[in-house]
Structures are given as structure tokens and as C-alpha cells.
């Protein structure tokens, strides 16, 4: 069978000639495989009539259509579908008591959707997206497996779940106050002091959440999950913003929690995953289109198959190439000319002082800045980039430096196109194709009033 995915943000029926419908072979034969309900509405693709020729994805000027062939047996195990011609999830992982069960896969495969289902926030619709999800149907569907009792317990309130979201940068938007105040509100277990000590949050308790670093927000989110004293702990990406020592510390605490609870973890750090997980469910598919959760494997076997790109038991190739690690790193054989140099400088930011020794950067080189959190790595890079000023810092010669910030701001008021134009301005024609700039992004002309970029 074939599934059709329509990216509603990319589809612009007012700006195209309906190439997907015009060139579709079944449509030319009188079969309404692709239909436009109205003059300005997006198309509806009937998957049961699709022959999988692949013409519409190639003809769509915006790349808004994906036609994917999948085995027929997968369609019998669909767990959740967001809507017509939208992402769908196949199969579910099996929970284990007193163990850490991990999900491993690329982005956009449905791992977060799976965690939302396991937490009870999302009730699976089994592909019937037009009807209201029914918890009784979920229990009946899994009545002969461990999942049946699992869903019965969380729906009846016999077992409490708590989900640590991956979007820790959104915490300042939904929570107000200091880190201590937020932790106190979640302190159902009465173990506030213990959690603060375990997560090394003692020096951050008085800090307002709006000024907290990414690492502090991550530990705040994890600490809040610990304090709610749930029976089932679901942690979606626990290591982002944390240095290696903090990652190891968090992993140890989660292993301790798993002795008394059911723990699910989504993690991309393979070293931490290998250490913390008792079993791993691999998730494969196509980003934004569909995801398939396979049966659990040992952590070492799952990681090796993920890196190789081939699932042996399932006989499925999830990637056309393997990910290999060379024993020896890349070594340059010739010396490159110096690009930029800086002197010894000191910068004071409140109670924090950074002292930097003189150094230089050569052309065609990749320089790593290694150290624990809150030691001034970001401040050092900001000084070099000219984002932060240090009175005695001399960086010369002054070259154009592109700075990608550690924290991504989503407070920009305007469209993606307007943000891009505000950033690159007159250079937009050398960066993007003429068709995109004049026909898609700015059909009515470039904006006259510029917003500030990120």
C-alpha cells in the first residue's frame, strides 16, 4: 500500500497550477485520486486509489507531497494518525516494571507522540482520526497484552504518570517565579532537599526561571518530574544543555528511580543510552510521514543495528548507509594561515568573571571549546563574535563572524520568510532561488519594515 503525506505549510494552491492533479495518471483516466474540494483549498489524496507512481511529489513546485510505499501488514497495526494525509504511528513499545525502557530513532519518527500516548496525554485513534478517541477501545485493543493492563491502570488512575517534555526552553513561558518556587509547587513526594542535592541545583534555587540557563532548565524539568512521585516516569531527551558530568549524574539518578518505577526514556546520546537502558525499542520510518516501533532489543544490539542502518530480525534497512567511527581523527598535513587573533582579556558579568588567554584561529580549521556548564564558554565565543563587549578584549583583524546562539528564540513576530529577509536582506538573491523569493515567500514584494533577526 501507499501512504500520502501533505505538508500543509508548504502547500500553496493559490500559487501553483495544480501540477499534482494535472499529471496524476489515475486522474487522467477519470479516477479522482487527487481532488481539490474548492478553488483555493489544499488537495485531498485518496490513498486507496494511489498507484505510487511518484509523479506528484516530483511535479509539486513546493515539495509539499510525499508518497511512500509501506508493507500492507503495517496498516493493520496503525496506532495513531493526526489527520487526513498526515503523520501516522505504527506499533507501541512494551512497558517493563522496575526497568529503563528506551526509544531510539531519528527525529520526526513519532517518539514524542509515543511518549504522549504512554503518559495518557494522547489517546490513540488507531487511524480513525475523524472520530473521538475512545479509551475503552484502547484497552480492548490491547486486552491480550501487557499494554492492556498498562492503559487500564493509567486511565483509571491506579498508576500515575509524569512526562518530562523535551522542550525545556519553553518553561519560562509557562512557569513564573524562582527555581525553588517551581520545585516547591511540584513537591508531592516531600523530597525537595534530596532532589536539589542530587541534581546540583542548590546554587540555582534563588534564580528566576526567566534568567536560568539551558542546563538549569533541564535539571529543573527533571527535578519536577522526580518530585511528583509518579509510578511511571517518562523522560523525553534528558541530556540536552547538560555537560558530560551532569549527564552521567542524571543517568545514575534515573537508574535509581527505575528500581521502584516504570521508566521510559527518549535519548540521542548513544553512550548514555547504552549505559542507562535495560532494553531499547528502535523507531524507524520517514521523518514527518510515519514511524514504526520495533520489538525491544538489548541496548548494545539496538545501538549497533541503528548505526549499521539495518535491522537484522526485521530485515529492514532504515538507512542507505552505516555510521562509522574512525579510530584516528582527521589530521591536517599543512599549516593554514592565521585568520583571527585575540589578546588576554577579562570580562565581568555580575558575580561571574571570565579570564581568557590569548590565542588564534587558523583558516580551514574546526576549534572545539570544551568544559563544564556555566564556566564561560558561551561568553568567550560571544566576545570573539562581537555579540558581547569586553573592554580590554582586542580581536583582530575584524572579520565577519556568523554566530549561532545556544538558545533558540521563538519570540520573533512575523513569518519565517520575513525573518530570513531581515537577516540576510540584500543578499537574499545569492542565498535563495529567484522562484522562492518572488513566487513563494514574497509574491507581493519584499517587506518594507524589517523585524530584528534572532
Region spans (language model):
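Iron-sulfur cluster-binding cysteine motifs and their immediate structural context
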Residues: 17-39, 44, 55-72
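ABC-family P-loop ATPase nucleotide-binding domains
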Residues: 79-84, 89-90, 129-214, 228, ...
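Hydrophobic anchor residue at the start of the ABC signature
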Residues: 114, 222, 250, 454
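Helical segment within the ABC ATPase nucleotide-binding domain
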Residues: 247-259
